[in-house]
Amino acid sequence: AEVYAGFLAHADHNIGRLLDYLEESGQRENTMIVVVSDNGASGEGGPDGSVNENKMFNGIPDDIQENLAMLDELGGTKTYNHYPNGWAMAFNTPFKMWKRYEFNGGTADPCIISWPSATAGHGEIRHQYHHAVDIVPTILDTLGVEPPETIKGHVQSRFDGVSMRYSVDDPSAPSARKTQFYSMLGSRGIWHDGWKAITTHPTLSGWSDFNDDTWELYHTDVDRAELHDLAAEHPEKVRELVNLWFAEAGANEAFPLDDRSPLEIFTTPRPQLAPPRDRYTYFPDTAEVPEAQAVNVRNRSFTIGALVDIPGVDASGVLFAQGALFGGHALYVKDNRLHYVNNFVGMAEQKIDGTQDLPAGENLILSASFAKDGEDPPHVSTGILSLYHGDKKVGEGRIKTQPGQFMFAGEGLCVGRDSGEAVTDDYPNGSPHRFTGGTIKR
């Protein structure tokens, strides 16, 4: 919790720097600033917290002893930390539960709007009900801009939001938003004219029956904390709101409902511009390729090959890298030998070292080939990783590969360097450890 408080102080300081610049440049008075959180405090840290949230995305439970051993590293480069869900509950007080639930603990957020030259009141609170989708309509309304119905001949989707501008001008005006629909990982909610119906789907259980979920009812105009479930007293109101939820879900294309685990969600192929294929070619000196668009080597055999020219014994650096400290793999040259590392969810660096010096020459193929021969839960492929100079095997070892994404965001695929955080601590000077002493062709 202290780490997150420290980061918030850091964010506050840098927002202040932006405000100072706007003030100094004479733009502050006529600039609308909107500051909003993205959801309630998050409960993904589980009961014991986590020093490596990537475990959760890969279906691997945390170990409290490992967490305690890393206590002094929290907030540093060696951790991908998350607070325990008890802190999430505390952060959301007086609201209950946390992110991914439809209670106010998961959905109610602060929203600060500042526009000195256009608002008479300063530091005032507004109580109208609004949603994040209302921000863009508010800006357009403020600018007097009507969104186009078509762009370059393509019909645009409708805006779901309504402008909040009226609430800035009139604190006592009734809420312009009358209905708000919620759905996340199978849990559902609907707010309408001061009443809210909520049903909690068993968390990340996968494939449980939605018909078994029980709807609760709260009169949020007088019970913002949602403490008093009135479903038994007003069954007709529950039916009304549930029917409205289904209507809104249809209008918002929310079906089918999805209660898969994070690992299931992240390992299910999604539509992409380039269709999947058996062979991918990448080149050096290009931007990193995001993981969602790069070759997918999860839960399968694969080969990584680099076509290189090596004139002498000075070649060194990364040939290929994907991912980072909390999951990834890399093929690289060190001490004139070929090496491969597979960093399993940040838990273990599995290193395979070449046993022979690199040959010199042109159009050499240096490769690492993984042959899957087994699988451990949850979808962890096991097998033999072999290193080659051309057709000559120069090293091998048994590894296991990561079941889900290497990284939730960032740290894509690179050729000739390792961008961001290094996949391994075996690089002499850390990342990017660019390849030198030779030429990578592809």
Question: Where do the PLM segments sit?
Answer:
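Secretory-pathway/luminal and periplasmic proteins that interact with or process carbohydrate-rich
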Residues: 40-48, 170-177, 392-397
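Short, solvent-exposed loop/turn and secondary-structure capping segments
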Residues: 19, 31, 43-57, 122-123, ...
